[in-house]
């Protein structure tokens, strides 16, 4: 396995650990606009229903939070043109600290990204770093309805089970 593949696998495990520990419904390799020229795939999409007072009600789905993660192992991966699709209410770029520093030094604007997540020193969790271009007054980046987002999560999990 190449160093790039190993880095991607390590970052992916950390994303999966974070999604699972926060009790999100999630899937990896989630496709949108499948079969069209605009088809896009997001590395990880998670969903947590809105549950005030820990009670599920009819608005729990529409008011829930969708979180998108794009995993990039190195600069060539970042600039490859693949990925960097952010459709969630909250969006994260996940990368090694060295790539984050490169992007920061170059002043690369990260549109629609709330934070950059890098492995902690222990390598057991993800640590947030500021995204350049993030606007805290912007409440949500999501432009797709909850039913579509959830359906794509279901489809991605179904396709994975079939393979």
Predicted regions and their residues:
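Non-catalytic C-terminal interaction segments of nucleic acid-processing enzymes
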Residues: 2-38, 104-163
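Short, flexible loop/turn elements at secondary-structure junctions
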Residues: 30-32, 48, 72-75
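Active-site beta-strand-loop-beta-strand hairpin of nuclease catalytic cores
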Residues: 39-68, 85-86
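Catalytic cores of nucleic-acid endonucleases
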Residues: 60-119
């Amino acid at each position: 396995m190449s160093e790039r593949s190993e880095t991607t696998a390590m970052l992916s495990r950390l994303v999966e650990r974070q999604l699972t520990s926060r009790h999100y419904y999630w899937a990896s390799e989630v496709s949108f606009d499948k079969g069209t020229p605009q088809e896009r795939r997001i590395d990880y999409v998670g969903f947590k229903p809105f549950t005030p007072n820990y009670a599920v009600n009819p608005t729990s789905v529409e008011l829930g939070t969708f979180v998108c993660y794009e995993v990039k192992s190195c600069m060539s991966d970042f600039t490859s043109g693949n990925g960097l699709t952010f459709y969630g209410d909250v969006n994260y770029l996940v990368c090694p600290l060295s790539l984050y520093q490169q992007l920061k030094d170059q002043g690369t604007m990260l549109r629609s990204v709330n934070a950059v997540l890098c492995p902690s020193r222990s390598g057991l969790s993800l640590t947030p770093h500021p995204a350049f271009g993030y606007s805290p007054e912007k409440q949500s980046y999501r432009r797709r309805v909850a039913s579509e987002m959830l359906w794509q999560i279901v489809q991605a999990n179904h396709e994975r089970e079939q393979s």
